[in-house]
């Protein structure tokens, strides 16, 4: 049953509906039903078949570069000009502009097969992708650097897992900073995903 169809007593029957109920007793019962351990964010959670960890357990989070003062053009002038990536609900539309790689520090430019997350935009937050070439992320994109060696297939798996957490966020509750870092994801790639031909899922 969804919220719009939830049945509640009408105003005239409200008094009879709550008659005999104790607020203190109800609060006590609610507290007793809580599992405090489950409410605490854990670094690692172990389920029946899968072990989970926070995003920051597996990745180092790197914020993108603000567009202020950056020289951007709408086309690739030559090989020195690389995509400046913005949030998007599709990877094909995530190129905001092209920027000259010589204007950035080496650690501000990320290589092909880098995992990144959109952290802003009502229709684009939380969507995650693996880059198809060198790029510079804008300030509404977070780059994820694996803390262990990962294959391309593993990065695509984690991009899918992160995107599946989209329902937890909104334009008013953006997946930035600690909120993004605390997303729970599997520690290892599932066997089902491992059996997929990676070339069938690359956009």
Feature map (PLM): residue ranges:
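Short, flexible loop/turn elements at secondary-structure junctions
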Residues: 89, 121, 148, 187-189
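A short beta-sheet element
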Residues: 97-161
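Extended, Lys/Arg-rich, non-catalytic nucleic-acid recognition/anchoring regions
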Residues: 167
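A short glycine-rich beta-alpha junction/loop motif
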Residues: 2-3, 135-142, 172-197, 201
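Non-catalytic DNA-recognition/assembly elements of restriction-modification systems
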Residues: 1-93, 190-203
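Beta-strand elements of modular eukaryotic interaction domains
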Residues: 72-74, 106, 174
